[in-house]
Swiss-Prot record:
The gene is nusB. InterPro entries: NusB-like_sf, NusB_fam, NusB_RsmB_TIM44. Belongs to the NusB family. GO terms for cellular component: cytosol. The lineage of its organism: Bacteria, Pseudomonadati, Thermodesulfobacteriota, Desulfobacteria, Desulfobacterales. This is Transcription antitermination protein NusB.
Amino acid sequence: MGDRRQARELALQALYYFDVDKGSPDELLALFCSNFEDRIDESIRPFFLDLVKGVTQARAEVDDLMNRSSSNWKVSRMPIVDRNIMRMAIFEMLKQPDIPPTVSINEAVEIGKRFGTRGSGAFINGVLDKIRVLKNIDRGEKE
């Protein structure tokens, strides 16, 4: 498994924890890092922290995009795993220009298949692709 995939999977776990606990993001991140320091290798730490902090800071914007792009689903009703996977991918598409949007979407779909429900991959793919089109995010990629 690649470093970025590991960082994304750990970030998903941290964001899930934030969603359930509702405490201070800084305190929860410090506690998460303390509890899982053996799993947060130095090679993945910067990307992991960028994802967690970035998603936390951009959450209102990201959640608004998800609400506008998911038919009949409000973010609050989405499975916690799915919504946090999509939050990471949307953050990457909006704020990480070095990562092609198709990579962010594909990674999200694969992580959704691993950690979500049977339908998570298709749901995540549909919402993220709508957002990619809505925000005109292609960075020169060919369809």
